[in-house]
Amino acid sequence: LVPINMAVNTAQTILQILVLVLTRNYVVYLSVQIVCSIILMALQNIYITQKYSEVDFSSKDRLPSEKTVEIKRNVSGLIIAKIGDYLVNSTDNLIITKLVSLAATGIYSNYLLIRNMINGFIATLFSGITASMGNVVAVENDEKKLEIFDTVFFCAFLIYSIEATCFMSLYNLFIGDIWIGRNYIFSAGTVAVIVLNNYLTGLRIPLITMKGAAGKYLEDTWIPFGFAIVNLVASILLAKPFGVAGVFLGTIIGSLFTADWYRPFVIYRTVFHAPVKKYFRKYMVYLLLGVGYIALTYWLNAQIYLSNAYLLFLVRGIVSVGVPALLSCALFYRTTEFGAIKTLTIRLVRGTTARLCSKKEDRNG
């Protein structure tokens, strides 16, 4: 399903950009999203029906009552969690509008649009991992589950640390000098807080993925609501003295005081049956390294001056990707997680190369 998701998401992003540029109509922009979502669900249904043709999807057989009750409880927990997540994600814009200004909300929407597009592609990757993790949870022992989780956690660190360095160094350059003008950008300090908040969100994704794969929907249903309350209070208190940066500092505080410490306990206690201190050690290492990568790359890019904004964007982009990637390779190349990702990458490259060569031979034949 990953290629289908990625193809539709790519087409949706391109169409939405064209709609905004050509029509400047937000209703049409949202309509494109709705249509693409319907098309994606239809394609997923066709793929699953063909892939698992041995399954009778029209069967009228009923599940045992205990299974039905379990599914209903899990679905209820999932719905509650989604409502809580919506409350968390929807409060920031409201607080910025009310306590800072409507103009600041408009400026932030530029950053949010770019972030959502990039994160959409990354989410497609992790959506494919969820299904694999579900199989791991079902058939593997606790040690193997933890080993695979550590690899996914490291993968999230690699991806989101590179994304964070790119955002910090390229956000204002792209929005201010290439896209719509320097009147529509935030200060570097505010951008840093926005980037840090997104980075912390990325580091939480492996836990959320494992939670979904293991079906642990009821153990932490209070988390999104607790997160939303702490986020709301902290953001309101910090918005006055620090503006937009204060709102996202409140979000960071909300996550640190709720999801970032409680959810690991749930997963490690109920899925891995292992002590959680190992997770927190890795989390602190990844957090500090991510912040270090952001600071170092931003400083290096600040030393680069070119008159052409497009060329400057290209050069800074190469630096923003290269520095964290090379440093991570140097620091982690002896670890089990790095070895697993290296092996998987080599396997994917070889498989892709073999398929391309096979298609070329078929055409020549």
Label every PLM stretch briefly.
Residues 272-275, 298-365:
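Membrane-proximal transmembrane or re-entrant/amphipathic helices at the cytosolic face
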Residues 54-57, 111, 115-153, 208-213:
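Helix-loop junctions and terminal segments of transmembrane helices
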Residues 26-30, 44-89, 132, 140-147, ...:
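Interhelical loop/hinge segments that connect adjacent transmembrane helices in multipass membrane
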Residues 1-3, 27, 195-227, 237:
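Membrane-interface junctions at transmembrane-helix termini in multi-pass inner-membrane proteins
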Residues 10-42, 50, 218, 225-260, ...:
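Membrane-interface helix-loop junctions in multi-pass transport and translocation proteins
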Residues 8, 32-44, 48, 64-135, ...:
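Transmembrane helical elements of multi-pass membrane transporters/channels
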Residues 18-22, 122, 146-202, 232-240, ...:
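Alpha-helical transmembrane segments of multi-pass membrane transport and lipid-handling proteins
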Residues 10, 27-49, 112, 148, ...:
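Short alpha-helical transmembrane segments in multi-pass integral membrane proteins
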